[in-house]
């Protein structure tokens, strides 16, 4: 009988240790996965931060660094900046629009992708509607700020941007903001004929959430910035601007990037590591006591 009791006691102890071990493994696995997800999220947003590309940005008296970027990737054709927003990125173009959905401007795989000109557009911006795509991301990354223009107060305060191409800075005067279906063929095809251009002008007039009193003619060169929106099924936010010979220097603030957000995420990672260490210490102590 004593032998049977001892066997039962040993079995219970082994089972108890086994349950503790399984629980520890599950907790550590979940915490490790959470830590990895935070780290991976950091990597995506770090690559999407406009500050990463600032050293390559062409300036009035210096474009050498931009040419160096073009040597790294000859798909780089220009630079887009929307004043007083976080949109301040190199611009790329290739024969396949899908490529830069998940490729950065240096040609590396990246979930944040790049800001890219529609493959069917002329890289010298001689078309009537020049369509530029970018991911809508949180933390104001990539084209995340396009959605801000659907707020009338924001739209009213943000009029200008700049587009650098062919070695020259050109101004952009933003005219309208629209929300359209992604499958709207008129909106996302390059207009060639005069009829198509007139139809595009009507599209803007009839679908703008907000529009400035600026005339558009078929002889203009429009810059169409488009990105996803969750406000409607298959929705796209479409910011319409017009190229001008006048440039518009930014007057207020520079892009501050995502340093604070990254710091917060790194703090979370440190807390996870501390908790893992504490859990292991408690488990070891419990085993010793037993």
Model-derived regions: residue spans:
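Solvent-exposed, non-transmembrane regions of membrane-associated and secreted proteins
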Residues: 11-265
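N-terminal Lys/Arg-rich, disordered targeting/topogenic segments
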Residues: 1-16, 290
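C-terminal single-pass membrane-anchor helix
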Residues: 255-290
